[in-house]
Structures are given as structure tokens and as C-alpha cells.
Amino acid sequence: MTIYLPELEQEHDASFPDIESALHDPDGLLAMGGDLTPKRLLLAYSHGIFPWYSNDDPILWWSPSIRGVFIPENYTPSKSLKKFFKKSGYSITINHATSDVISLCASTRPAEETWIMPEMIEAYQNLAKLGHCHSVEVWFNNELVGGLYGLQIGQVFCGESMFSIKTNASKIALWKFCEHFVAFGGKLIDCQMMNPHLESLGAIPMERPIFNERLQVFSAISVFENCYQPQSLSNG
């Protein structure tokens, strides 16, 4: 089957097609090409668009009809996770090792399963240097054993990926970030594509028009000052 996709130009024009023009099959595929400059990435995320592609593909841009999201104020960890954390010896930080978290999200996956290409790693590390990309780290005996990273768009956190080297590390990173994010005025965590794993963690599906309506409202309001300052959250 032949499909038509708008092809984005590099550098000169960072605009995107209307998200309602995204394909139904594959669901949410909107455009191809362009680049991963900070300007384009920030524009994309502010309109509910994100890059997702494999090694042999051009850059592909998506806005799925059903979005996976966490409502952080409604997030409730399981009793078993709470019990585990108390005895875990884990410590949780924000923005202590963003570059390492991004790299580990790529390297801890089998090569054929990761979409985090070297150019993606570089792009998000550049966004971190500019203050737009942030991470949550889980440490055990001073070793980085889990975490997550994503982009800040006002009161929305656009989660990109997470990793876990030791038991429950990524689940605890998510839990502790939800608590922190709510305390600083955060409203929504975007998980992009809904899948069974995210659903098992508490993500819910949200239709594209509703997601983008909330994105436009929440992205216009900043979280409280110091939300993303490097800091410690809690210790197990």
C-alpha cells in the first residue's frame, strides 16, 4: 500500500501539518523528514507531536489518535511497591545525571528494539543543556540503576523513555516524580503511545482532541519555581 506523507524541510521552516491530518494506518503518522533541532522539537511537543522512528527510517513524526497519559495527582503506587521502596536502599534525585539517563535508556534495550538513535540522544542532551529536558534518577550504592527523562512544556511533562537495571527502579522513578510534579503544579504526564505496560503502571487513554485541548491550556502555565532544580526527592 502506498501512502502519502508530507515531507518537512530542514532548518528553514519548522512548521508541521495539522495534527488532524495524521494517518489512520499507521495510526498517528503525520509527517517525515526535517531535523531534530531544539526549535523544531519544542514546536512539535507543544502541538502534541513527537519523533519516533527506526534506524533505517527517515525521521517520522507522530500524533496518535489515542494518547497514553498519567494524571499525576491520581497516581497511586501499589502497596507492594511502597513496601519494596522502604527496604530498597534506593535514593531518588532530579536532574543529577540527565545525559547518563538518556544514554542508558538507549543502551539497556536490545539494539533492534530501541528508537533512541545517536542523533536522538544528542538532540535531547542538547535540550537538557538548554533547560528543556529533565531527568529523574534512581541510585543504589551511588550507582545509577534506573530513571526516566522527558521534556517540560509548562505544566505538562512529555515523558520520552525510562530504564531499570535493578528491580522496580523505573516504577519508583515514576511514582516519586508524580508526587514531586503535583507538588510543583504539574497537571499531566504524556506517555505518547498507549501500550499494555504503561496501562499496568496506571496510564490511561486520552483521545487526541482532548489531549491537545489540555496541552494548550496546561502548556501556557509554568510549574512552580525550582521544580526542575537539581535536588534529592527521597530515600528508601
Curated annotation (Swiss-Prot):
Q: Name one GO biological process term.
A: protein catabolic process
Per the record, what are the reactions this protein catalyses? N-terminal L-lysyl-[protein] + L-leucyl-tRNA(Leu) = N-terminal L-leucyl-L-lysyl-[protein] + tRNA(Leu) + H(+); N-terminal L-arginyl-[protein] + L-leucyl-tRNA(Leu) = N-terminal L-leucyl-L-arginyl-[protein] + tRNA(Leu) + H(+); L-phenylalanyl-tRNA(Phe) + an N-terminal L-alpha-aminoacyl-[protein] = an N-terminal L-phenylalanyl-L-alpha-aminoacyl-[protein] + tRNA(Phe)
**Location (main, coarse):** cytoplasm
**Gene3D superfamilies linked to this entry:** Leucyl/phenylalanyl-tRNA-protein transferase, C-terminal domain, Leucyl/phenylalanyl-tRNA-protein transferase, N-terminal domain
- Please state what class of enzyme this protein is: transferase
Q: Where in the cell is it found?
A: Cytoplasm
Q: Which UniProt keywords apply?
A: Acyltransferase, Cytoplasm, Transferase
Stated EC number for the protein is 2.3.2.6
Q: What GO MF terms are annotated?
A: leucyl-tRNA--protein transferase activity
Entry annotated with the keyword Cytoplasm? yes
Reading the lineage from the top rank, the first entry is Bacteria
In terms of InterPro entries, this protein maps to:
Acyl_CoA_acyltransferase, Leu/Phe-tRNA_Trfase, Leu/Phe-tRNA_Trfase_C, Leu/Phe-tRNA_Trfase_N
Q: Please provide one cellular component term from the Gene Ontology annotations of this protein.
A: cytoplasm
Signal peptide from the UniProt entry: none
What function does the entry list?
Answer: Functions in the N-end rule pathway of protein degradation where it conjugates Leu, Phe and, less efficiently, Met from aminoacyl-tRNAs to the N-termini of proteins containing an N-terminal arginine or lysine.
Question: Which family does the entry's similarity section mention?
Answer: Belongs to the L/F-transferase family.
HAMAP family linked: Leu_Phe_trans
Descriptive protein name = Leucyl/phenylalanyl-tRNA--protein transferase
Gene transcribed to yield this protein: aat
